[in-house]
């Protein structure tokens, strides 16, 4: 291979390596290796060497460094990367490469950086040999707020959990967080062991049951329920999270155990509808849950509805699930009262649902202008077109559709509205002034072109635009219309 190197000039080999982005070519012999200081490939050669366990390459570079009579560019290049050895320590703690960690330590890596986080990664991934090595290097068992059992529980290594507890690690830190993480990742045997050791399944308002339900671990849910007798099903969101994530069997199990379907006025069926889980919705409907128009109050942002008059069908519309909407209509859900679903579909950009609702006989006259306003505010051009073509008034509410489009910076919608009769001078030239405030030169030029009055721009407007830092539009006004700050 040495002879091959000399078949071409160095400059050609550099171009070949740069073009192919193939670092391995540099490792074929020392002649090619010396090109390392000349190439411009994206890959970090030092990183490539370490991650592939080419320690003999590092030994070679180390020997070059010892030769004080000559300067080798590759030595300097490798030295640039030795200040970041700890990130490779973390990688090897995760992948379980103890020998590589030892080599990094011999090169000067500090395994205790960032409050012994390397220890956590080794524990999380179940590498006992690395754990013991790090402890021998002074790592603190109680660093990072004594979270080692949490890490082992998260990673699912029962033997590591047992060992840590046997040497005094806290398995109940932060209100039984290790138990919750074991529930989250589905490690039933660790859950059982922690409970046997004294972990409380009721901690954090039954968060372990809620977490297992959310993640779909039916076996863990059953085990936890069997270990508690005081669940307040009136306020337990386990079934709601199970419904949200399409875990039908868990929903059924929790209902059989007494879960309250009317929690927060029916958020269980709402989250199932919003996320498109038709089987769960059908199951809940079979139990008699109301789907009509009703007042609900949900005191948590988890389910996206707060203090609104909301029919369940609105949740299906919000999620864009046409089949769910059709199902609700087929079993009698109201879609005509206040046209709530229609406006909701316009807000969330679901044109096919709008067309379906129209086909089912809703009256466009009632809420079409409101639907137009919300569609403009959200940037849904195709819905705006559909509504205008079906009678929506682009001048409604003193030109509010255009104002909403301007505020959202939706120039395509603004152009469409203007082409259909919207007045760019309405509401004290709001369209132009909003474009100026946002600093959008293209939009400013467009509104002036179609008739916005630049003479309505006051000195106060200019000062406000200046405070906002819109220098480009200010310069345009000055150079084109001689309008400038006084």
Curated annotation (Swiss-Prot):
<feature type="repeat" description="ANK 8">
    <location>
        <begin position="307"/>
        <end position="336"/>
    </location>
</feature>
<feature type="repeat" description="ANK 4">
    <location>
        <begin position="174"/>
        <end position="203"/>
    </location>
</feature>
<dbReference type="InterPro" id="IPR002110">
    <property type="entry name" value="Ankyrin_rpt"/>
</dbReference>
<feature type="repeat" description="ANK 7">
    <location>
        <begin position="265"/>
        <end position="293"/>
    </location>
</feature>
<feature type="repeat" description="ANK 6">
    <location>
        <begin position="234"/>
        <end position="263"/>
    </location>
</feature>
<protein>
    <recommendedName>
        <fullName>Putative ankyrin repeat protein R634</fullName>
    </recommendedName>
</protein>
<feature type="repeat" description="ANK 12">
    <location>
        <begin position="427"/>
        <end position="456"/>
    </location>
</feature>
<feature type="repeat" description="ANK 5">
    <location>
        <begin position="205"/>
        <end position="233"/>
    </location>
</feature>
<feature type="repeat" description="ANK 9">
    <location>
        <begin position="337"/>
        <end position="366"/>
    </location>
</feature>
<feature type="repeat" description="ANK 10">
    <location>
        <begin position="367"/>
        <end position="396"/>
    </location>
</feature>
<dbReference type="InterPro" id="IPR036770">
    <property type="entry name" value="Ankyrin_rpt-contain_sf"/>
</dbReference>
<feature type="repeat" description="ANK 2">
    <location>
        <begin position="114"/>
        <end position="143"/>
    </location>
</feature>
<keyword id="KW-0677">Repeat</keyword>
<feature type="repeat" description="ANK 1">
    <location>
        <begin position="84"/>
        <end position="113"/>
    </location>
</feature>
<dbReference type="Pfam" id="PF13637">
    <property type="entry name" value="Ank_4"/>
</dbReference>
<feature type="repeat" description="ANK 11">
    <location>
        <begin position="398"/>
        <end position="426"/>
    </location>
</feature>
<feature type="repeat" description="ANK 3">
    <location>
        <begin position="145"/>
        <end position="173"/>
    </location>
</feature>
<keyword id="KW-0040">ANK repeat</keyword>
<dbReference type="Pfam" id="PF00023">
    <property type="entry name" value="Ank"/>
</dbReference>
<dbReference type="Pfam" id="PF12796">
    <property type="entry name" value="Ank_2"/>
</dbReference>
């Amino acid at each position: 291979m040495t002879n091959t190197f000399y078949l071409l000039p160095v400059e050609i080999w550099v171009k070949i390596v740069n073009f192919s982005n193939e670092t391995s070519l540099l490792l074929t012999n020392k002649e090619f290796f010396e090109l390392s200081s000349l190439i411009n490939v994206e890959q970090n050669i030092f990183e490539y060497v370490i991650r592939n366990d080419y320690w003999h390459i590092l030994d070679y570079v180390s020997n070059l460094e010892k030769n004080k009579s000559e300067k080798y560019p590759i030595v300097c290049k490798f030295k640039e990367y030795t200040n970041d050895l700890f990130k490779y320590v973390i990688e090897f703690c995760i992948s379980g490469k103890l020998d590589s960690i030892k080599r990094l330590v011999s090169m000067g890596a500090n395994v205790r950086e960032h409050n012994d986080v390397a220890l956590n990664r080794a524990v999380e991934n179940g590498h006992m040999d690395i754990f013991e090595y790090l402890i021998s290097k002074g790592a603190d068992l109680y660093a990072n707020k004594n979270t080692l059992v949490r890490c082992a529980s998260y990673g699912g290594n029962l033997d590591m959990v047992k060992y840590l507890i046997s040497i005094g690690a806290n398995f109940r830190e932060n209100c039984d967080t290790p138990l919750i993480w074991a529930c989250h990742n589905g490690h039933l045997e660790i859950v059982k062991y922690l409970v046997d050791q004294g972990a409380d399944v009721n901690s954090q308002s039954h968060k372990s049951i809620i977490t297992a339900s959310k993640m779909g671990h039916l076996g863990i849910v059953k085990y936890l329920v069997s270990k508690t007798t005081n669940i307040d099903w009136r306020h337990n969101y386990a079934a709601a999270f199970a419904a949200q994530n399409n875990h039908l069997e868990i929903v059924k199990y929790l209902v059989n155990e007494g879960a309250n379907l009317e929690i927060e006025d029916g958020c269980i069926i709402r989250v199932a509808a919003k996320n498109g889980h038709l089987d769960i919705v059908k199951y809940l409907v079979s139990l008699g849950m109301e789907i009509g128009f009703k007042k609900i109050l949900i005191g948590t942002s988890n389910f996206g509805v707060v203090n609104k008059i909301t029919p369940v069908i609105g949740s299906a519309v919000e999620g864009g699930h046409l089949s769910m909407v059709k199902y609700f209509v087929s079993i009698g859900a109201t879609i005509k009262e206040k046209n709530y679903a229609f406006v909701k579909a316009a807000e969330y950009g679901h044109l096919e649902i709008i067309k379906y609702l129209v086909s089912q006989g809703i009256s466009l006259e009632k809420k079409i202008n409101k639907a137009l306003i919300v569609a403009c505010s959200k940037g849904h051009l195709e819905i705006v077109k559909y509504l205008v073509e079906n009678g929506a008034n682009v001048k409604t509410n003193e030109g509010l559709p255009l104002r909403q489009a301007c505020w959202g910076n939706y120039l395509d919608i603004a152009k469409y509205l203007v082409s259909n009769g919207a007045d760019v001078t309405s509401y004290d030239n709001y369209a132009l002034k909003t474009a100026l405030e946002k600093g959008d030169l293209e939009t400013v030029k467009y509104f002036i072109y179609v008739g916005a009055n630049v003479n309505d721009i006051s000195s106060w407007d200019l000062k406000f635009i200046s405070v906002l830092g819109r220098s480009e539009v200010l310069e345009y006004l000055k150079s084109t219309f001689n309008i400038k700050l006084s």
